[in-house]
Every structure is written in structure tokens, then in C-alpha cells.
Amino acid sequence: MASQPPPPPKPWESRRIPGAGPGPGSGPGPTYQSADLGPTLLTRPGQPTLTRVPPPILPRPSQQTGSNNVNTFRPAYSSFSSGYGAYGNSFYGSYSPYSYGYNGLGFNRLRVDDLPPSRFVQQAEESSRGAFQSIESIVHAFASVSMMMDATFSAVYNSFRAVLDVANHFSRLKIHFTKVFSAFALVRTIRYLYRRLQWMMGLRRGSENEDLWAESEGTVACLSAEDQATNSAKSWPIFLFFAVILGGPYLIWKLLSTHNDEVTDNTNWASGEDDHVVARAEYDFVAVSDEEISFRAGDMLNLALKEQQPKVRGWLLASLDGQTTGLIPANYVKILGKRRGRKTIESSTMLKQQQSFTNPTLIKGVTTTNPLDEQEAAFESVFVETNKVSSAPDSTGKNGDKQDL
């Protein structure tokens, strides 16, 4: 009887560990290994290695603003295109003094490829935003007054022209009637005889030539008086025009210079001169544009106060070296607290010294209070929205983790 072939291996026999020999009492045999068991499964026991994954970055400022909000102070003035041709007439023509438009002032600073602007361009626009908004409001106010005066002037002017048209029609009617009556020789003869009769009876003195000379003298006197009044009335618009031309640029320059001084004072928080907020970087961040700054985990950053923070969701205005400012993701740093600036400390020290010199007896009983808690409470509202959208639980600061600086 022929021997039967050996049965196929069982599942538990095919999942032997590589290198293990056959069971005791059995001869050498093949070693089976499963396909799903690789050499990497056998690791040495020990502490597992954990890597901190940085939280996701919220949309960048250039993606949030886009091309709709970058022109907040670059509107296109195209509202002045009015003409008053409806009030005109065939005899004097229509009056349309204002027909213009400022369509060249509105443009988009983003290029076609939607690259974010440089840090210099953004800083220049942010520094001049308030000044241009003030100028824009002034321009709109003058534009509204100009449109009102334009409408009033057009209404008065066209009413005056309508009255002149009526007077002109009456004068034409008089001329036509005069021509009709003067066409008759009989009327002229009767008129001549009537005047001669008046001269003969003494009812009319002088001759006809003297009457004509007297009438011409009165006409010349009236014309000279009207010319003097016209020349005097034409002088004040010239002075007003030059006042606007010279005074407008001066006012704009004063507004820009004043706003630039305020912007320079508002950037002292980066160097620590003014009050600022201190934060510690929890993750590494690499900037992808000039409006951002790079930092590494463990770096100490100075953050701007709540009033100076840009209205960008999930991003904060910060400085690493005290000179360069840029945006950083809010969920990559941990807020430590608010620190008083050097100017504030010096001014408070000088004030205390002056008070101690002037009234030393009252200073002994005064208990000094630490304003750090109040300052921190005022600044917590800046990061409320950031803490909600942050995915990492340790990426934002809590009240218990803040340190007194």
C-alpha cells in the first residue's frame, strides 16, 4: 500500500517565529513564517518615543482679506457725473458744468498670481490708512457740499435764464409791433406833425438832437457803473481758488506727518519701550511671506497690545528681535502675561520719587498694589477667539499658567 503524502500545515503551525526550531523530540524540519510578520515587529521593550505635532495653521491674512478688503482706503470716485441739460433751452443752450469722474484712483494692489504683498508695502499702507481715511471723509464732505451747491446754482441759473427768455420774447414782440407800425408812412407823418405842434405851442422845449444826446449820456453812465460792479465781483473767486490750491496740499501734509509720528510711537512695544505682552513659542514656525516672522520653539516674543493687534483671525502681531514686526500664528505660542515698558517704569519711578519728596509722611501708609493682574485681565480678551479655534490643548495660555514678569 503506497504511503500517503503528509497533510498540509495547520494555521498555527505556519505562524512560527522565524529562527525557532521544531518542537522537542522532533527532527529538523522546515521553519515556516507568515507573510504579515516582518523583522520590524520585534522591537526592544522600552519607553516609546513621542513627537509633538504642531497644530494646523489658520488661513493666512492674504487668504482671509483677498482682493476685496485691501482697498479700504482706495475707493473709486465715480459719483460725479451729473449734467443739467434738462434745464436748457434752444436759445441759450444747456448748462452742464460738471461731468467728470475719478475712475483712476481705485485699483487692486494684488497681482494676478495673488502673491502676498511685501512687509514694507503692508507697513506703509497700515501707517497711512488713518490719514487717507481722514482725507477721504474730508473729500466726501466737500463733494457733498459741492453737489448741493451745484444743484442749487443750476436751479437758480436756469430759473434766471427762464425769466430772461420771457423778457426776450416780450422784447421781440415789441420789436415786431414797432416794425409793423413804423411800416406805415402815415403813422410817421402823424408823429412828426404831433412833435412839431408841441414845439410850436411851447409844450416841448429844445430840439430832437438834444433829447438824443441826453439819452445817450444816461446810457453810458449806466454801463460804466455795471462794468465796475462786474470787475469787483470777479476778484474774490480768484483768491478763493488760490487759497484752495495752496491750502489743500498743506493740510494733507500736516495730516500725514501727524499720523506718521503716531505710528512711530505705536511701534515702541516691539523693543520693550512701551507696554507689551510676552509669549513663548511652543513650536517651530517658518514664514512664507514678508509679513510673517519665523521663530523656533522656546523663543521669547513680544506681542502688541489689544488695541494695536490687526483684525486677522488666528494671527498676532509680534516681534522677535525688537526691531522687525510681523504676524505669527496664535496657536503656536503660549501667552505668559503683560509686561510694563521701560518708559512706564521710569515714569512711575520718577512719580514715586517726586511724591516721596513732596509728602514723605503719606507714602509710608500707602500699600502698593500690583497692576499686573489688572493689565493681564484687560489683555485676556485678545486671545479669547484664538483659544477657541486652537486644536492643541497646551498651545494657549491659561490664567493659572501665567507668570508674573
Curated annotation (Swiss-Prot):
Residues 274-338 form the SH3 domain. Pfam families: Peroxin-13_N, SH3_9. Residues 1-136, 195-235 are peroxisomal matrix. Residues 1-11 have a biased composition (Pro residues). InterPro entries: Peroxin-13_N, Pex13, SH3-like_dom_sf, SH3_domain. Residues 177-198 are annotated as: Interaction with PEX19. It comes from the Eukaryota. One of its GO terms (cellular component) is peroxisome. GO terms for biological process: cellular response to reactive oxygen species; cerebral cortex cell migration; fatty acid alpha-oxidation; locomotory behavior; microtubule-based peroxisome localization; neuron migration; protein import into peroxisome matrix, docking; protein import into peroxisome matrix, translocation. Residues 158-176, 257-405 are cytoplasmic. Keywords: Membrane, Peroxisome, Phosphoprotein, Protein transport, SH3 domain, Translocation, Transmembrane, Transmembrane helix, Transport. The modification Phosphoserine is found at residue 356. Residues 147-235 are annotated as: Targeting to peroxisomes. The chain crosses the membrane at residues 137-157, 177-194, 236-256. Residues 61-71 have a biased composition (Polar residues). It is a multi-pass membrane protein. It is found in: Peroxisome membrane. Coiled coil: none annotated. PANTHER family: PEROXISOMAL MEMBRANE PROTEIN PEX13. Interacts (via SH3 domain) with PEX14 (via SH3-binding motif); forming the PEX13-PEX14 docking complex. Interacts with PEX19. Belongs to the peroxin-13 family. Component of the PEX13-PEX14 docking complex, a translocon channel that specifically mediates the import of peroxisomal cargo proteins bound to PEX5 receptor. The PEX13-PEX14 docking complex forms a large import pore which can be opened to a diameter of about 9 nm. Mechanistically, PEX5 receptor along with cargo proteins associates with the PEX14 subunit of the PEX13-PEX14 docking complex in the cytosol, leading to the insertion of the receptor into the organelle membrane with the concomitant translocation of the cargo into the peroxisome matrix. This is Peroxisomal membrane protein PEX13. It comes from Mus musculus (Mouse). The gene is Pex13.
